[in-house]
Amino acid sequence: GSIALKGNTLSSDNITIEPEKRTISLAFQENSLFPHYTVKKNILLGAERNEIKKDKSINFEELINLLDISHILNKFPHEISAGEAQRASLARSLITKPDLLLLDEPLSNVDQSFKEEIQEKLKKILKNSKITTIIVTHDSYEAFYLGSKCGIILNQELKQFDDPYNLSLIHI
């Protein structure tokens, strides 16, 4: 398949966005933090490497407070929990305020007791920043809660794509 974004097309065969215009971030099911950097350095790394201007990025302090990770900024990945690492990875992907955010099971490692709170905060961040986001998840509640549009894929085929409240799981 392909994705059209701001007049540019991305596909597995062709990416036609010039490097200086690429603002795509991603976060995986497994955190991808660099073990030799602190959490703070991991989060800021994307913005620094891409020379993102402050007016283009999401406010660092606001982001770490929303994701409740201010207490782990000076720690290394091996010193924090899986849920904290997942939230730090999410912060790193959001800090650049990308045009497109790709998330693969972004909250799978977050404790259930904390998951709904993070979903609420993530929804707020995505809504306020107007980031186009594609989330792959097995958690239908998460998809319906976070998504303005949801697709249901079964046997590698898109069965439905609509507003979450219009989808029917019965006929699948």
What residue spans do the PLM features occupy?
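ABC ATPase NBD coupling module
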Residues: 9-25, 49
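ABC-type ATPase nucleotide-binding domains, specifically the catalytic core motifs of the NBD
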Residues: 13-14, 37-57, 66
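Conserved ABC ATPase "signature" region
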Residues: 55-72, 124
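Conserved ABC ATPase signature
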Residues: 76-80, 84-86
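A short, proline-enriched helix->beta-strand linker immediately N-terminal to the Walker B motif
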Residues: 95-99
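Catalytic Walker B motif of ABC-type/P-loop ATPase nucleotide-binding domains
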Residues: 101-105
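Conserved small/polar residues in nucleotide/adenosyl-binding loops
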Residues: 170-172
